[in-house]
C-alpha cells in the first residue's frame, strides 16, 4: 500500500486547506450575491407594487392609512421605544414618565404621517407641492441671488424635511442642491433620489459635495446648499461640541467649513406644521459673511436655533435616531 511521505503529507494538507478556503470564500460570495439580488428585487417590488400605486392616491385617502401605521409602530412594534424614551429623558430631565409617553405617542403619530408624505412625494405635482409647502419670506434668500451669491441653508430632521428637498429648486431663485448621506440600500437610494430631483433639485453626497461646490462657485452659479446638520457625527474627533438639550452634543461642522471656504451667507430655516399636510418655512440669517465671525460662531448659533425649534414643539424632531451614540461629556466645547 502506497504511503505519503512527510513532505507529501504537508503539501497535501496545505493544498487541501487552500481548496477549503477557496470553497468557503466562493460559498460566501454566492450567499452574498443571492442576498444582494433578493434585496434589490424586494426593494423594486416594494416600490412598483406598493409605494408608487399608493403615491398616486390623494393625500386625504393616504392619511387614513397613517392611523393603522401608528397603531403598528406604537402598540405592536413599540418602534425604538427605549431609544425614544432615553433621548427625551436626557433632553428634558424635568419631564415625568407620563409626559414622555405622551410625546412618544405624538411622535409615532407624526412619524406615521411623515411616512405617508414621503410616499406621496414620488408622484406629487409641482402645484400640489407649492400649495402645501411654502416659504413665508423667500425674499430673504433671493436677495443674495441678486447679489450673485450662493447660500448655505442649515436645518434639521424636524417636521417634513423631504418636501424641502423636493421643492428646493422652486422655493428660491438659486439652483437648489441638497447635501445628504448615502443609503445602505443602493437601489432604494436611486429610487428616492429620482423622486427628490424631479423638479430641478440636485442631490449630492458627502463624498462629492466639494467638487460640486467648487464647480458652482468657480463658474459663478448661485446655488442654495441645503444641509441637515443635526446628524450624529461619524468621526467624533472632527466635530463641533455644544451644550444642546441639556447635554454636550457633537455636530457635523461641514456647513460652517463650506461657508467659510467661499465666504457664503448662512441661513437657518425652520419648518412649521400649520395643519395636516401643510407646512410653512421661516428663514432667518445666521450671518452674511462668515469671515467676520470667530471660528465656531456659526455652529453655535445653529445649535441655539435648533434647540429653540425643538423645544417649541418636541414631537416633530427625529427622536428615534441614536443621536447621542457618542459620549462627549469629557470633550471641550467648540471645534474638536
Residue ranges and their predicted role:
Residues 1-38:
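N-terminal amphipathic/basic-hydrophobic helices that include classical n-h-c signal peptides
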Residues 26-155, 190, 194, 200:
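Membrane-anchoring hydrophobic helices of lipid-metabolizing enzymes
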Residues 79, 135, 159, 186-187, ...:
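Residue-level recognition of alpha-helix initiation/capping sites
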Residues 102-105, 143, 207-336:
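Non-catalytic C-terminal accessory region of glycerolipid acyltransferases
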Residues 138-142, 165-169, 189-193, 213-214, ...:
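Short amphipathic alpha-helical segments and helix-helix/interface helices
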Residues 147-207, 234-244:
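Catalytic core of membrane glycerolipid acyltransferases/transacylases, capturing the structured
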